[in-house]
Amino acid sequence: MNLQNNVLNQIHQILLPTNPTLDKPNAEATKEEFSSAENRDEKDYLTNQQPKNLSTPSTSSNGEFIPHIFYSLHQIRKDPNNLSNQLETLTGSIRHRLKLCKSLISENEDTKDLLSKSPSEWQDIIHQREQELQIKRDVLDDLYRKLQR
């Protein structure tokens, strides 16, 4: 996916599942690019929020949200009295990633504007921009022909 908005790129990287070749979540790789102390604290928090259950598959601890939530519910159903099998504990990393995305969105007005539009509005905007590009192409073609004469 090619996103031109920097904040949307960051959100996209945070929400991506674990990169299997690096054996660490893309969210951590994205956070390593930031230099502020606040982001380093968030990375430490994210690391501390990972489930400590060794029987959890590695893809579910940092992977996509839905499989992670279903696995957490399965663990709770399997052993409801185990303190480490609480939904809050097992889904802590998901909540943290979503809060991080929410804060990124709330801090940037351009991102709010982009995300506030409906798909039908985007179709209209895309169509309008395609028309503008076609007009610009036509003008450039006319200029090129005039230069060739």
Curated annotation (Swiss-Prot):
**Where is composition skewed (Polar residues) in this entry?**
46-63
- Select a single GO molecular function from the record's annotations and give it: transcription coactivator activity
This one is known as: Mediator of RNA polymerase II transcription subunit 9
The principal localisation class reads: nucleus
Swiss-Prot/TrEMBL GO biological process terms: negative regulation of transcription by RNA polymerase II; positive regulation of transcription by RNA polymerase II; positive regulation of transcription elongation by RNA polymerase II; positive regulation of transcription initiation by RNA polymerase II; RNA polymerase II preinitiation complex assembly
| Subcellular location(s) of the protein | Nucleus
Show the ranges annotated as biased composition (Basic and acidic residues): 25-45
Per the annotation, the residue ranges of the short sequence motif Nuclear localization signal are 77-99, 136-149
